[in-house]
Design a protein with these regions (language model features):
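Catalytic domains of riboflavin
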Residues: 1-213
Length: 213
């Protein structure tokens, strides 16, 4: 039941049977933004973490929905840090969805590729000494990327969505969603011009984390 009433990619269905949903949805509210008017809901997962969904259009009537799965970045999205392009990616995705009239952003609270804000700043300090973003994570004892997309898969299933076009430069998200039973029909690339502060960071994401630019 629904919770309320450009490159070709392989389509793979997850093999594991879905268990009963472990997520709880808030009510729906209007969210007027500088990108247009959206609807917003909050989702609480089994661990008590709160994630955000913003969407517009008749998503339940869309055969293949345009979706952006975006991980929290306080430094970029609140303080407009130029060390990354996270805020620009989110802006790009919201503008794209507004232009199409239908789509969804799933905003996951997994700061710093899953290591949290405290450790993200520790990693920044190591990067200031010459390590790259992957090396800094490893130096702190973390994998290069600790993010999970299980909750995103659950959210999509609860909306009755099984086929999407994914707005991303990260092919690992495609594999993760396919493993959770979501068919990714197309990858919609995000085109952001690098700046002097994040150019090396983005190059490392391409070289070591398989991002496509």
């Amino acid at each position: 039941m629904k919770p309320d009433a450009v490159t070709t990619i392989r389509s793979i269905r997850g093999n594991n049977k879905r268990s009963e949903s472990r997520i709880v949805f808030s009510e729906v509210a209007k969210l007027p933004t500088s990108h247009g008017e959206f609807k917003v809901r909050v989702v609480k997962d089994a661990r008590g973490s709160e994630h955000v969904i913003i969407y517009k259009g008749a998503i339940e009537d869309t055969d293949i929905l345009d979706v952006r799965i975006h991980s929290e970045c306080l430094t970029g999205e609140v303080f407009e840090s130029r060390r990354c392009d996270c805020d620009q990616q989110l802006d790009w995705a919201m503008d794209y969805i507004e232009s199409k009239g239908t789509g969804m952003v799933i905003y996951l609270r997994q700061e710093g590729r899953g290591i949290g804000l405290f450790n993200k700043i520790r990693a920044y300090a190591l990067q200031d000494t010459g390590l790259d973003t992957v090396e800094a994570n490893i130096e702190l004892g973390f994998p290069s990327d600790m993010r999970s997309y299980e909750v995103a898969g659950e959210i999509l299933h609860e909306f009755g969505i099984s086929c999407i076009n994914l707005i991303t430069n990260n092919p690992r998200k495609i594999d993760a969603l396919c493993n959770h039973g979501i068919s990714v029909m197309r990858r919609i690339p995000i085109l952001i011009e690098p700046n002097e502060y994040n150019r090396h960071y983005l190059n490392v994401k391409g070289d070591k984390l398989d991002h496509l630019f």
